[in-house]
A protein has these predicted regions:
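Non-catalytic helical/linker scaffolds that mediate oligomerization, partner binding
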Residues: 1-313
Length: 313
């Protein structure tokens, strides 16, 4: 963190802290590989405490107490597009589950209880410690994950002096409380990935438009994240749909674009940032009628675009 802060200062970039927020996650233990493979029909258990180190299928949920709130016949989904299991029995020390949709269960992955709301604290203990550190270091940009109340925003502003709070909209509860959250926040961030775990993926385009519209009503900046340049995590070129999505998002009134996995684990993080910056620049030219005239006069070919995209290789 200190290293990042020094680099950010040199580049005159404000460093931000993103909280974990109220979310259930997996804890894989007792195995060399940090994942479990389960198939449809498999019976497995979720331990309420991660103590059995020799368990060949050792998995628990964080926070631990959440297991006591789960009832029989509820469905658990592990990560987006991951395995799904139904709770058959809730015993004193574990949940007995049956897999209904096979897949991998990774470590520290998000967990959803389908069609069932569980009230979780706004911040983990790790979050609270991180906010104290942010305050001591003078970090002023705080992103609240899974923000679902003005209480969370007030807590951050009391804990971190002069904090600029960006509330992340990524749950149904966030949408229900959107007006209050927009009113009390300094900015809004739409996480399309986590939001998809709570609402139908077909509704994401319309949720995005509605959230941006509400943020603009309160004169708050609104940013959009997830699947921005997903293809560049592994590939060398973005898709035309991705480029069009970015420009379409800007046309909706978004204040900016946020890169996540593209720069965290992608193999061309710098290129991703350059592409977004270039598109924003071209969008501004287009708004004042300059870019389209340039395209008509001197058409940029796909080959020339590839040269530009790969110039740093």
């Amino acid at each position: 963190l200190y290293q990042y802060q020094e680099i950010a200062k040199k580049l005159n970039i404000k460093l931000g802290l993103d909280t974990e927020g109220a979310q259930m996650r997996t804890n894989i233990y007792g195995k060399k590989e940090k994942y479990l493979q389960i198939r449809k029909g498999d019976i497995f258990k979720i331990n309420k405490r991660s103590t059995k180190k020799d368990d060949t299928k050792g998995i628990s949920l964080y926070p631990n107490y959440v297991c006591d709130k789960l009832e029989e016949n509820l469905k658990i989904r592990f990560d987006f597009n991951g395995a799904i299991a139904i709770i058959k029995k809730n015993y004193k020390d574990h949940l007995e589950c049956m897999c209904t949709n096979g897949g991998l269960i990774g470590n520290n992955k998000g967990v959803d209880i389908l069609n069932h709301y569980i009230d979780l604290p706004d911040f983990t203990e790790k979050d609270k410690e991180a906010l104290e550190i942010a305050n001591s270091l003078g970090i002023e940009e705080i992103f609240i994950s899974f923000c679902k109340s003005t209480k969370a925003i007030n807590f951050v502003k009391k804990t971190v002096r002069n904090a600029k709070v960006t509330s992340k909209i990524e749950s149904k509860m966030s949408i229900h409380k959107l007006d209050d959250i927009c009113n009390f926040s300094d900015a809004i961030l739409i996480d399309r990935g986590d939001l998809t775990r709570e609402i139908n993926i077909m509704d994401i385009p319309f949720a995005q438009r509605g959230i941006i519209k509400t943020a603009k009503k309160y004169n708050k900046p609104c940013y959009v994240a997830t699947n921005i340049l997903e293809s560049l995590i592994k590939d060398n070129l973005p898709t035309r749909a991705e480029l069009n999505d970015i420009v379409g998002t800007l046309e909706m009134g978004a204040s900016g674009i946020v890169l996540a996995a593209e720069t965290a684990i992608g193999h061309k993080p710098i290129l991703c940032a350059e592409i977004v910056n270039e598109l924003i620049h071209r969008y501004k030219l287009y708004q004042v009628g300059l870019l389209f005239a340039d395209i008509e006069r001197d058409e940029i070919t796909d080959k020339e675009m590839r040269v530009w995209l790969n110039r740093n290789d």
